[in-house]
Amino acid sequence: MAEIGIFVGTMYGNSLLVAEEAEAILTAQGHKATVFEDPELSDWLPYQDKYVLVVTSTTGQGDLPDSIVPLFQGIKDSLGFQPNLRYGVIALGDSSYVNFCNGGKQFDALLQEQSAQRVGEMLLIDASENPEPETESNPWVEQWGTLLS
């Protein structure tokens, strides 16, 4: 089964809740999953030839939460090319804002630029439609976990 690093960007805890639920689901499927709540580049490096799941909200004018900015900047400034990385993204946002789910979209764009391979589609969760994000993320994670080798 797969080894998965779950990297969290959160402001109010919803992304962490989604990540912890994902960890439980993936572990139940036989995968080895680990959540990184305040992730740094050193946490990311062991997963470059494995799987990562980025779970992040969006804050301000479409920005990443402070907790995941150091990781994002570290990847952008230090890594460059990650063709062996396979990843998924769960993005939380509110569609009443112009930059809906932009935190997750930024992460996806960065990893695409670095030739990482996204597994499945990115999940966009709208807080204005679904105040309990795990009800939308849990089925997605169950499906995503079946795509990993």
Curated annotation (Swiss-Prot):
<feature type="binding site">
    <location>
        <begin position="99"/>
        <end position="101"/>
    </location>
    <ligand>
        <name>FMN</name>
    </ligand>
</feature>
<comment type="similarity">
    <text>Belongs to the flavodoxin family. MioC subfamily.</text>
</comment>
<keyword id="KW-0813">Transport</keyword>
<keyword id="KW-0288">FMN</keyword>
<dbReference type="GO" id="GO:0010181">
    <property type="term" value="F:FMN binding"/>
</dbReference>
<keyword id="KW-0547">Nucleotide-binding</keyword>
<keyword id="KW-0285">Flavoprotein</keyword>
<dbReference type="InterPro" id="IPR001094">
    <property type="entry name" value="Flavdoxin-like"/>
</dbReference>
<comment type="subunit">
    <text>Monomer.</text>
</comment>
<comment type="function">
    <text>Probable electron transporter.</text>
</comment>
<keyword id="KW-0249">Electron transport</keyword>
<feature type="domain" description="Flavodoxin-like">
    <location>
        <begin position="4"/>
        <end position="145"/>
    </location>
</feature>
<dbReference type="InterPro" id="IPR008254">
    <property type="entry name" value="Flavodoxin/NO_synth"/>
</dbReference>
<dbReference type="InterPro" id="IPR029039">
    <property type="entry name" value="Flavoprotein-like_sf"/>
</dbReference>
<dbReference type="Pfam" id="PF00258">
    <property type="entry name" value="Flavodoxin_1"/>
</dbReference>
<feature type="binding site">
    <location>
        <begin position="10"/>
        <end position="15"/>
    </location>
    <ligand>
        <name>FMN</name>
    </ligand>
</feature>
<protein>
    <recommendedName>
        <fullName>Flavodoxin YqcA</fullName>
    </recommendedName>
</protein>
